[in-house]
């Protein structure tokens, strides 16, 4: 066996497609391009995402909106944290000891009856109360 005698296995290779070489080849006349029109011309390229008239995937799927970068405050009802209302000072840590909220919380808003009375006790700028008296 020598390198010059090596051949690929029978049927493992295909002849390249030779278009436009007569009707008998099966790839003559229109050269595998179908009939007339834009798609038969040279330089034709379908738009990215074009699916032949079918509604494209990017139009079939629903829009996904953006999420705001401005953090919304975590809202807590004053009635749920009555123990905190009795304290002299209200801080984020004192609320955390009584009420669970996500660790990613940057601001807390206290709402409900009595929230405005707590405004003087709050010693943390990350905590606010509802505006109603």
Swiss-Prot record:
Database matches in SUPFAM superfamilies: Ribosomal proteins L15p and L18e (SSF52080)
Keywords assigned by UniProt, alphabetized: Ribonucleoprotein, Ribosomal protein, RNA-binding, rRNA-binding
GO molecular-function term, one example from the UniProt record: rRNA binding
GO annotation terms (biological process): translation
Top-level taxon: Bacteria
Function: Binds to the 23S rRNA.
Protein name: Large ribosomal subunit protein uL15
Organism name: Wolinella succinogenes (strain ATCC 29543 / DSM 1740 / CCUG 13145 / JCM 31913 / LMG 7466 / NCTC 11488 / FDC 602W)
């Amino acid at each position: 066996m020598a390198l010059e005698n090596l051949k690929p296995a029978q049927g493992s290779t295909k002849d390249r497609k030779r278009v436009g070489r007569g009707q008998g080849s099966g790839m003559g006349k229109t050269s595998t391009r179908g009939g007339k029109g834009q798609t038969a011309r040279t330089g034709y390229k379908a738009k990215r995402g074009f699916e032949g008239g079918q509604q494209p995937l990017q139009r079939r799927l629903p829009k996904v909106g953006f999420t705001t970068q401005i953090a919304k405050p975590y809202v807590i009802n004053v009635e749920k944290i009555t123990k905190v209302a009795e304290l002299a000072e209200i801080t984020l840590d004192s609320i955390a000891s009584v009420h669970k909220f996500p660790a990613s919380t940057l601001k807390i808003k206290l709402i409900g009856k009595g929230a405005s009375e707590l405004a003087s006790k709050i010693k943390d700028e990350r905590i606010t109360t509802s505006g109603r008296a």
